[in-house]
Design a protein with these regions (language model features):
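Bacterial N-terminal signal peptides
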Residues: 10-21
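Bacterial N-terminal signal peptides that target proteins for export
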Residues: 2-12
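Sec/Tat signal peptide C-region and signal peptidase I cleavage site
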Residues: 22-26
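Interaction-mediating elements
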Residues: 27-155
C-alpha cells in the first residue's frame, strides 16, 4: 500500500490562519496613557472612579480602531473597550460564582457536574450579555459560555 505524504489542505489553511493572527494589524498593541484619547479616559474614569488602571492597549476590531483599558477594582479585574470617540464597545469582568444568574449556574452544573471553575467572566457588548468560564472537569480544562438564560453559546 502506497502512503501519501505531504501537507493536507486543512493543515495549509490552519497554518495560514495562524500566520494571519500574528500580523501587526491583527494584534493588540500596548500603549501609554498619553496615547489614549482624552474622551476614552474620561468615559472610563466616570464609570469606574475607584478602579486602578493596570494598562492600556489599542487594536483593530472589525475594521475599527478600539482602545482597551485594563483595570482592577477590589477583587474584580476588568477590561473595558472603547472606540476613539469614547463610545463603549465591551466590558469583560471577572465575577464570583455567587454572582451568577441561577439559570447560568444550573446550566454549568448540568454540563460539568463536580467541575472546578478556574475563571468566570461576564462579557457585555451593547445589550448582549454572556458568561464565559474556564472549568476543570474529569482531568480536562474546557472553555464554555452561556447567555443569561443558561443557553450554551459558541465561543
Amino acid at each position: 500500500m502506497k502512503r501519501k505524504t505531504g501537507v493536507t489542505p486543512a493543515l495549509t489553511l490552519a497554518a495560514l490562519l495562524l500566520g494571519l493572527t500574528s500580523l501587526p494589524w491583527a494584534q493588540e498593541e500596548q500603549i501609554r496613557r498619553k496615547n489614549v484619547p482624552a474622551v476614552v479616559l474620561a468615559a472610563f474614569e466616570k464609570t469606574y472612579p475607584n478602579a486602578t488602571i493596570k494598562g492600556y492597549s489599542k487594536e483593530m476590531d472589525n475594521g475599527q480602531l478600539v482602545y482597551e483599558i485594563e483595570s482592577v477594582e477590589g477583587t474584580v479585574t476588568r477590561d473595558v473597550t472603547y472606540t476613539a470617540d469614547g463610545t463603549l464597545v465591551s466590558v469583560e469582568e471577572t465575577l464570583e460564582i455567587s454572582a451568577l444568574p441561577p439559570k447560568v449556574k444550573a446550566a454549568l452544573d448540568r454540563k460539568f457536574p463536580g467541575g472546578k471553575i478556574r475563571k468566570a467572566e461576564k462579557i457585555t457588548k451593547g445589550a448582549v450579555v454572556a458568561y464565559e468560564f474556564k472549568i476543570r472537569h474529569n482531568g480536562r480544562t474546557s472553555e464554555i459560555a452561556f447567555d443569561p438564560e443558561g443557553n450554551e453559546l459558541q465561543i
